[in-house]
Swiss-Prot record:
Gene3D superfamilies: Diaminopimelate Epimerase, Chain A, domain 1. It comes from Pseudomonas putida (strain W619). Substrate binds at N13, Q46, N66, G76, N77, N159, N192, E210, R211, G220, T221. This is Diaminopimelate epimerase. The keyword Amino-acid biosynthesis applies.
């Protein structure tokens, strides 16, 4: 059978988006891995699936597969594209929608200027909820990699993140250290690794090594986690403007117990069909 899909991106973080509300198919990890290959498939960072909800209090179910076939809890850049997609495809007439993910319920708001604001919910810091192996909760944790200690913040935005502060984003060891942090045994479900260079109280640069995808042009949940870590430790104040390789995201967070708001673009690239 042929499935219709849309290729989209949020700041260069690119997605294949499938509507499984009006189409019906059983998507398996092997399909994501096959389609995600940039040489022999469609090529993407993540596959986003739109489904009818299980929960009557939400509008849609939102599933995410990495290009390596692993299903993950959350994707912030994908959430913005998800909101744009369901509106463009007339699956809803609402500009503000609620969707369920493996990481919890999030709210998406398509603004008049085309930007999308995502209410990502409150960050989580309790190690067992990230999950991260630690004796007690702290703002910073020493993490040993190849005999060297690195200071990290550990945060969940519905998916796990480690945030490291660096002096210069251009020389940050994203490709050397990133995969080692991703697969560190203290993160039992693996982790996304963010490398943050603070410019001033409201501006910073960020690169993210994403779990199951490698370095991407942008990572929405990574931007949220980095902003939360920086505000928590007194390095920055809300609102935070983060420049990633693919462009800029704006993050607001009022402090513990409150939701993180992320605003950025969502762009449709092309429509296609793929054989299942």
């Amino acid at each position: 059978m042929l499935l219709r899909f849309t290729k989209m991106h949020g700041l260069g973080n690119d997605f294949m988006v499938l509507d499984l509300v009006s189409q019906h198919a059983h998507i398996q990890p092997k399909h994501a891995k096959q389609w995600g290959d940039r040489h022999t498939g469609i090529g993407f960072d993540q596959l986003l699936i739109v489904e009818a909800p299980n929960n009557p209090e939400v509008d849609f179910r939102y599933r995410i597969f990495n290009a390596d076939g692993s299903e993950v809890e959350q994707c912030g850049n994908g959430a913005r594209c998800f909101a744009r997609f369901v509106l463009d495809k007339r699956l809803t007439a609402k500009k503000r929608i609620r969707v369920e993910t493996k990481g919890g319920i999030i709210e998406l708001d398509v603004q008049n200027d085309g930007q999308v604001c995502v209410d990502m919910g409150p960050p989580r810091f309790i190690p067992a909820e990230i999950p991260f192996v630690a004796d007690e909760q702290a703002l910073n944790y020493p993490l040993e990699v190849d005999g060297e200690l690195h200071s990290i913040a550990a945060v969940s935005m519905g998916n796990p993140h480690a945030v490291l502060r660096v002096d210069d984003i251009r020389t940050a060891p994203v490709h050397g250290l990133g995969p080692k942090i991703e697969n560190h045994p203290r993160f039992p479900q693996r982790v996304n690794a963010g490398f943050l260079q603070v410019i001033d109280r409201h501006r910073a640069n960020l690169r993210v090594w994403e779990r199951g995808a490698g370095e991407t042009q942008a990572c929405g949940t990574g931007a949220c986690a980095a902003a939360v870590a920086a505000i928590s430790q007194g390095w920055m104040d809300s609102p935070v403007s983060l420049d990633l390789p693919g462009g800029r995201l704006n993050i607001e967070w009022a402090g513990p117990g409150t939701s993180v708001l992320m605003t950025g673009p969502a762009v449709r690239v092309y429509e296609g069909q793929v054989r299942l």
